[in-house]
Amino acid sequence: MAAPQVKSSSELTMAVLGCGTMGISILSGILSSLSSIAQDPSPPPTNPPALPRHFIATVRSPSSVAKVESALSPLVKPSVSTLRVLQSTSNVSAAAEADIILLGCKPYMVSGLLSASGMKDALTVKHTEGHARSQKIIISICAGVTVPDLERVLREDVGLSADNLPIVVRAMPNTASKIRESMTVINTVDPPLPDTVTELLTWIFERIGEVVYLPPHLMDACTSLCASGTAFFALMMEAAADGGVAMGLPRAEANRMAAQTMRGAAGLVLEGEHPAILREKVSTPGGCTIGGLLVLEEGGVRAAVARAVREATVVASLLGGGGAKNVNGTRH
């Protein structure tokens, strides 16, 4: 293992424990952004005073080590950032060194990972010459695992006292983080996080797209709409392309046209156009659009899509062993 890097007061270490596809995307966005900041003589004043510049990624197998190194090493600039990719046997040492720990493992693996031998000491705030090290930040992107779930594991399974608990955050990015177009939802907490932590979290997840903060009781619905929603919209896009192919369009062109049309509609909504107004603007009297829309309404597309979001919300809550409210008996 390489020797730990010496950090300045403006440099943090971030460990991704269980660095799969999402972890790679997040680190890719951060590393690329750090390189851009280094090339800009006047970086934005909105950047937090301390940024993660040293990174440790842990994975389960040697082949995964090679995969992560292949994806991320080209983005590392020696004068700007450092990266080490280790096997998961190094989870404890990675956590000990890190200021920020991102849990990228499967939800069912969280307890076992955090309760590993030595993890209690790795996560405990150390006191040296009368000065306490800052609290670590644990960010979970594990579907269905709540902040209380994580805090319970840290207290009961890891054995940390209330005074030594890290700052625990739940965030839910989506697969579009790969192209920096994620919609990430971060769980608000009570009492609120310190401003410095909020600024840091926002900066991290804005490297891969947009960020919003919402209360914990909405997180499973956010998982459904933002994470599962990618698949829902892909199905609608595929269906639209199928219709075009049925009417004679080549498959490749139909896929491209459907994707670009969906992107255009999304862009208009993000610019402030209400979806209903957008739909109305395109629906000229006696035209083809209103004819097609009536077929969609007759087929119950609106209700089916809404119910899919509700059902996925229920399943998301079950992933972490929790419950979901306001689903009105959608499961049967």
UniProtKB/Swiss-Prot annotation:
Keywords noted in UniProt: Amino-acid biosynthesis, NADP, Oxidoreductase, Proline biosynthesis
Protein name (record): Pyrroline-5-carboxylate reductase
EC number: 1.5.1.2
InterPro entries: 6-PGluconate_DH-like_C_sf, NAD(P)-bd_dom_sf, P5C_Rdtase_cat_N, P5CR-like_CS, P5CR_dimer, Pyrroline-COOH_reductase
Catalytic activity: L-proline + NADP(+) = (S)-1-pyrroline-5-carboxylate + NADPH + 2 H(+); L-proline + NAD(+) = (S)-1-pyrroline-5-carboxylate + NADH + 2 H(+)
Pfam families: F420_oxidored (PF03807), P5CR_dimer (PF14748)
GO molecular function terms attached to this record: pyrroline-5-carboxylate reductase activity
Enzyme type, top EC level: oxidoreductase
Single biological process term from Gene Ontology: L-proline biosynthetic process
Pathway linked to the protein: Amino-acid biosynthesis; L-proline biosynthesis; L-proline from L-glutamate 5-semialdehyde: step 1/1
Source species of the chain: Neurospora crassa (strain ATCC 24698 / 74-OR23-1A / CBS 708.71 / DSM 1257 / FGSC 987)
